[in-house]
Amino acid sequence: MLVTIRNARPVGGTITAPPSKSMAHRAVLCAALAEGRSHITNLEFSKDISATLGAAAQLCARVRTGADDAVVEGLGHFVPLAAPVDCCESGSTLRFLIPIASLTGQAVSFTGRGRLMERPQSVYDALYREQGLRFEQSAAGLTVEGALTPGEYRLAGNVSSQFISGLLFALPLLSGNSTLHLIPPVESRSYIDMTRSVQAAFGVQSHWLDENTLAIPGGQHYHPCDYTVEGDYSQAAFPAVLGAVCGGVTITGLAPETLQGDAAILDILRRYGAKFTQTEAGIPFTKSPLHGVDIDLADCPDLGPVLMVLGLLCEGTTVIRNAERLRLKESDRIAAMEAELRACGGVLESEGGTITVHGCANRLHAPAGVLHGHNDHRVVMSLAVLALSTGIPLTVDDAEAITKSWPNFFEAIKPLGAEVEYA
């Protein structure tokens, strides 16, 4: 799908952050693993969340969805699978479910779309082989079989926290205690603690023995509960950058106290010189001069694409470090954003996981043709921010990629002054 994004009027208005995709994944799985009825409210049925709900229904739960909520009734047992579990393009769904699959007493196969089956699973591969379990991955899918055993687990702390969260879901249900030793540095710690927080709401506990070691008591049970998903800082980063550049934007629906790692966007924007206040009522942005900064992306890689846009629109140079994981997402996000921003006159370069972006707002221009969305939701949304921030109409392909995380994105930005034309 092609969309053209342009300014219908000067940027300004109020936008509500969508529900947190990260927290919704976790709540759905905890509810599915509990025996009984849980009610999850403030949901948005993106493709990723729909994949997790579908997997829960295949494995161990009855699921009924409403307009913005779901009732998940955990069966208290796993059911025989008649077909592979389709994770669509959701890395969280796949990586969270692999250890859970080891609880089912059967071989479980997973399929996916796009680049999902190309994304590395070496952490689980090594762990399963170490325990003598089956782990087979190919371009067509992934199959695991065999039961994890309680005990000592050692994982690199600088891999995706999704692997650690996946083990956190499954290990409390084993018969004995387990310990997760994370080899420092531990990145994305906030996402580990987010998993633990949602688990605690469903009655499952773990605790830090020290900054790198998690103790997970065995023999626990998830208990059903009612759970409300808070607003998503990862998605709010797009209107936040727009507000920082243009002013006049207010974001509502975000909890001031949160475990979401991408809440770091507010601290990062303050360092750029952005002017805003945060209250329970919302976050209003006022236009102010912005200057380049040095950013460590290790704990918040999803912010990378939109921060590359911001780097072009401020004075000076922005250096984004520890961004290697961007190359292993729905697209190679570094290469994708470099190509599209250069097509608009952007000046930037990368080496490995370091990206250098030069402020060049006065040199930006309309591209010669259609920009490519690279089938990546964050690339598409970042290019929309570029269009509205600069007043340069942009036509982007693969625009349907937004359904992965924020299906209503284009409608949501219209009250901020956007005009969106579909083709």
What are these regions (language model features)?
Residues 1-423:
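Short, structured segments at the rim of ligand-binding sites
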